[in-house]
């Protein structure tokens, strides 16, 4: 293998591959010059990778972005060393009208406050000569333990650039974000931990799973015999308990519904384990799970979360659809907020009636709501107010949890954001431009992007749109498309961008909004491949440089061996020429 080919194989391989290590290490001048051999040894790898990564999305992309508008997409996750890493991705529309998302850097958040995060992000942007004033969108992690910091960061960028709009990325699981918000209420957080514990006990072995289904089958047969169940196709199917997961759609809601459905059967199996468990540990776990399941507070939160998550589930599912209908999705946001608010105004009594009936059916003790409530365990020492059980359940749990849900929905879907997305849907070419609306597009520019068009351009835009609405009917390349991103590319491809340059500018601004993106998730997938348990001591700069090359393979492959050697050579003086 030639020296240049060996270098190529190094930079194009996966970071985890070991096949070519010996070949790479042997890239050197004649063996008699032993000092040069050190050039390609592992201690020089960071330098080599850095010199290549410097050019990466760096690889010429910033030069295209200097005067263009772009969006910053930020996410955070822990690496193998348990360091909090923050991925920075830039979203923009290239000269051909295609959406591009480029991984720019990954930063270790040693002091993850809003101010330090902003300073770090601005440092990356300035390194590539990108102006903060050109930011036209912000997208942040869907489910994050840094929610407060993201809120502050969003506000700080808005101060520098008032048109850097935050938009919830539909690719992020909204349900997980709402669950994370509800878990800010301590007892709700404890509830989900207990739910996971119960499901794990029941699903940890096939024997228990079979017992659970056998008990449920016997229960259904008994109810059918006494005519308490109606039989029909698809009714009364025997299910199982569903695990809570942080990646599956509706997993929390499904898990709650499955436990309510299998509640009696679960209790029966737990009692069997308590009496006949094969080990004391299993008997103790079953006893803890049974006591948890038969407590009033657990039943209250179980049914409360079923109601709340049942309302939000329709919206969560709609946002995950591959073909997005923005207008209908925003309408679902409105109805979801209204239904959640209705729970606050008049849902308590209805919920309490359901819970009371459930407890009576399963012989669960219901406390006297007029009695004084005393917090359990360590919290009792910090309890200052003397409150009743009714106040604790209704105010501290029910109303507080609903308030957290509304706050999260309002944060992700503010009235401003909803109006922005609704107006932008007027550019949607689906169904032969069914929603195309000239007035709405002009309002969009006037209200949300006034700094990107001068007064004369705002006037000219309306006339360009009038021409476009007639022109598109007779142009097959523009007529038979279904997304705004396809429209952007079609305008460039057909040369129509020259005639409708103002429309093209509006489209590019809309496409920078991170309505749908998964690049940050892919970044962390790459991080897990690169920084493994065996390579957990990799420092942040070397990790970032490796990730840039690995994620942006298409650009990295455009480098020639000679350019890599020349860059490496420029690092410092060598005793021998490369």
Language-model features and meaning:
Residues 1-578:
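Alpha-helical structural modules in large enzymes and assemblies
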């Amino acid at each position: 293998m030639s020296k240049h080919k060996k270098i190529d194989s190094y930079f194009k391989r996966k970071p985890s591959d070991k096949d070519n290590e010996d070949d790479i290490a042997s890239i050197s001048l004649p063996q008699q010059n032993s000092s040069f051999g050190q050039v390609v040894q592992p201690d020089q790898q960071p330098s080599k990778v850095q010199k290549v990564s410097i050019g990466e999305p760096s690889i010429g992309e910033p030069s295209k972005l200097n005067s263009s508008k772009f969006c910053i997409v930020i996410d955070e996750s822990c690496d193998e060393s348990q360091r909090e890493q923050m991925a920075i991705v830039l979203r923009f529309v290239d000269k051909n009208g295609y959406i591009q998302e480029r991984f720019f850097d990954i930063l270790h958040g040693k002091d993850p406050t809003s101010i330090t995060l902003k300073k770090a992000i601005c440092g990356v942007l300035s390194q590539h000569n990108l102006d903060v004033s050109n930011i036209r969108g912000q997208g942040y992690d869907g489910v994050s333990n840094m929610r407060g910091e993201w809120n502050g960061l969003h506000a700080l960028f808005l101060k520098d650039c008032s048109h850097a709009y935050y938009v919830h990325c539909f690719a992020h699981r909204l349900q997980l974000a709402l669950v994370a918000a509800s878990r800010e209420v301590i007892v709700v957080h404890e509830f989900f931990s207990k739910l996971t514990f119960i499901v794990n006990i029941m699903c940890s072995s096939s024997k228990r799973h079979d017992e659970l289904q056998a008990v449920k089958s016997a229960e259904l047969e008994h109810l059918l015999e006494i005519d308490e169940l109606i039989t029909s196709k698809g009714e009364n199917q025997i299910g199982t308990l569903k695990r809570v997961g942080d990646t599956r759609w509706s997993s929390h809601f499904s898990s709650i519904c499955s436990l309510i459905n299998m509640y009696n059967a679960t209790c029966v199996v737990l009692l069997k384990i308590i009496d006949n468990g094969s080990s004391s540990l299993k008997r103790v776990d079953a006893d803890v799970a049974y006591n948890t399941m038969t407590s009033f507070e657990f039943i209250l939160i179980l049914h409360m979360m079923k109601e709340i998550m049942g309302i939000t589930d329709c919206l969560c599912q709609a946002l995950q659809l591959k073909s997005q209908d923005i207008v209908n999705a925003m309408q679902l946001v409105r109805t979801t907020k209204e239904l959640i608010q209705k729970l606050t105004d008049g849902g308590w009594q209805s919920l309490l009636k359901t819970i009371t009936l459930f407890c009576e059916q399963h012989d669960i003790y219901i406390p006297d709501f007029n009695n004084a409530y005393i917090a359990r365990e360590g919290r009792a020492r910090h309890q200052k107010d003397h409150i009743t059980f009714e106040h604790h359940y209704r105010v501290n749990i029910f109303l507080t949890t609903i308030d957290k849900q509304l706050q999260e929905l309002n944060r992700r879907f503010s009235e401003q954001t909803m109006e922005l997305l609704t107006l932008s849907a007027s550019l949607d070419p689906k169904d032969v431009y069914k929603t195309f609306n000239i007035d709405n597009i002009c309002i969009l520019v006037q209200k949300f992007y006034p700094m990107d068009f001068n007064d004369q351009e705002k006037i000219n835009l309306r006339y360009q749109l009038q021409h476009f609405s007639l022109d598109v009917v007779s142009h097959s390349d523009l007529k038979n498309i279904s997304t705004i991103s396809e429209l952007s590319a079609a305008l460039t491809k057909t040369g129509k961008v020259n005639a409708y340059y103002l429309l093209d500018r509006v489209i590019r601004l809309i496409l920078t909004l991170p309505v749908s993106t998964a690049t940050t998730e892919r970044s962390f997938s790459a991080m897990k491949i690169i920084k493994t348990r065996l390579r957990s001591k990799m420092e942040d700069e070397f990790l970032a440089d490796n990730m840039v090359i690995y994620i942006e393979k298409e650009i990295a492959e455009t480098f020639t061996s000679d350019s890599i050697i020349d860059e490496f050579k420029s690092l410092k003086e060598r005793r021998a020429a490369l």
